[in-house]
Regions:
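Structured helix-beta-strand junction loops
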Residues: 17-18, 63-64, 111, 132
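A short, polar/proline- and glycine-enriched secondary-structure boundary/capping micro-motif
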Residues: 58-62, 147-149
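Short beta-strand segments
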Residues: 18-53, 61, 68-73, 81, ...
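Extreme N-terminal tail/first-helix region
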Residues: 1-21
Length: 149
């Protein structure tokens, strides 16, 4: 397997196996991190999540679309230092609307069916993160990069 294919395979496996991610935004130079339920596109070019429009994260990402998304496989055990994989996705975020929104919600709710009422609430927004780069960390310090064209 080519190195790029191996990275993509590991990224896809991690995105499919994990339900939660941390989205980092910022305002006025002050970083802010938020836990979100997410789904990735099959080609790994986008990460999607739903948030209420009244949240700090929504306010921050509408002012500055640059975001980082952290997804990891840690289990809060000592073995995580050797076994866990983390990826950081660097990209830009925007709210999506119909008709794209309907298609994304189908994919999102297939992974998170318990969030159906929340996801369809008029007070919530579906956010798309367009990935520019992925940074994968394994074995605590082995870093691999994948840049999305």
């Amino acid at each position: 397997m080519e190195p790029t294919e191996e990275i993509q395979s590991r990224l896809r496996d991690l995105c499919n196996s994990q339900k939660l991610a941390v989205v980092s935004t910022q305002s006025g130079g002050q970083p802010y991190a938020s836990l979100v339920a997410f789904v990735a596109s099959e080609d790994l070019r986008q990460i999607f999540f739903v948030t209420a429009r009244t949240t700090r994260k929504f306010a921050y990402l509408t002012k500055d679309s640059r975001v980082a998304v952290l997804i990891n496989s840690s289990t809060n055990e000592e073995s995580d230092f050797h076994d866990a994989i983390s990826i950081t996705v660097i990209g830009t975020a925007e709210e999506i609307r119909d008709p794209e929104k309907k298609n994304i919600l189908v994919r999102y709710l297939s992974k998170h069916p318990y969030l159906e009422d929340f996801a369809h609430s008029p007070s919530c927004a579906v956010i798309k993160v367009m990935a520019k780069s992925y940074y994968m960390v394994r074995n605590f310090q082995n870093v691999m990069e994948l840049h999305v064209d």
